[in-house]
Amino acid sequence: MIIIAYLLGSIQTGLWIGKYFYQVNLRQHGSGNTGTTNTFRILGVKAGIVTLTIDILKGTLATLIPIILGITTISPFFIGFFAIIGHTFPIFAQFKGGKAVATSAGVLLGFAPSFFLYLLVIFLLTLYLFSMISLSSITVAVVGILSVLIFPLVGFILTDYDWIFTTVVILMALTIIIRHQDNIKRIRKRQENLVPFGLNLSKQKNK
């Protein structure tokens, strides 16, 4: 199951769509990343939506497979984490993958939909306020860590501690933050790419 999840995650949707349908190598354009945001920016809305959908479904499917097969000896959420590893370090693309946001969302959607929806609201609110995908992703990662530690104490969304769930959420979030180090530097310099949505409270001018 772990190998299947990893191979699912290794599917590089944006990279392959760019190569086979647009004759564009995403690694040579924009941020050079093969994930959803750069796909939207370089290849357009249609390619971006397809990439986002498939990257989410990779995580969801990897999480649901053990549930569908009735495997109870290992946590489906733990299995799903290997789809995130595959997305980030894909065997099909020289181990150079995306930033783990969409696939992490898919894993949460498959295992903890209420927690996923809560974080989605945080993501969309941050995006509306600041018009930055990267800042929204980083914010959700930080909020995710805090929430998985605090919510079980008060019984909000997460009713009790599950050490596997807590550990995997923290690992997912740290992966996202680490993969966004270049974005963090650009945000600090007020040079980060913006999306045409929201209030842009930082009043940064798009490049």
From Swiss-Prot:
It catalyses: an acyl phosphate + sn-glycerol 3-phosphate = a 1-acyl-sn-glycero-3-phosphate + phosphate. Its EC number is 2.3.1.275. Coiled coil: none annotated. Its main location: membrane. The chain crosses the membrane at residues 1-21, 42-62, 65-85, 105-125, 138-158, 159-179. The keyword Lipid biosynthesis applies. Keywords: Cell membrane, Lipid biosynthesis, Lipid metabolism, Membrane, Phospholipid biosynthesis, Phospholipid metabolism, Transferase, Transmembrane, Transmembrane helix. Pathway: Lipid metabolism; phospholipid metabolism. It holds the Pfam family G3P_acyltransf. It is found in: Cell membrane. InterPro entries: G3P_acylTferase_PlsY (IPR003811). One of its GO terms (molecular function) is acyl-phosphate glycerol-3-phosphate acyltransferase activity. It is a multi-pass membrane protein. It is an enzyme of class 2 (transferase). Belongs to the PlsY family. Probably interacts with PlsX. PANTHER family: GLYCEROL-3-PHOSPHATE ACYLTRANSFERASE-RELATED, INNER MEMBRANE PROTEIN YGIH. This is Glycerol-3-phosphate acyltransferase.
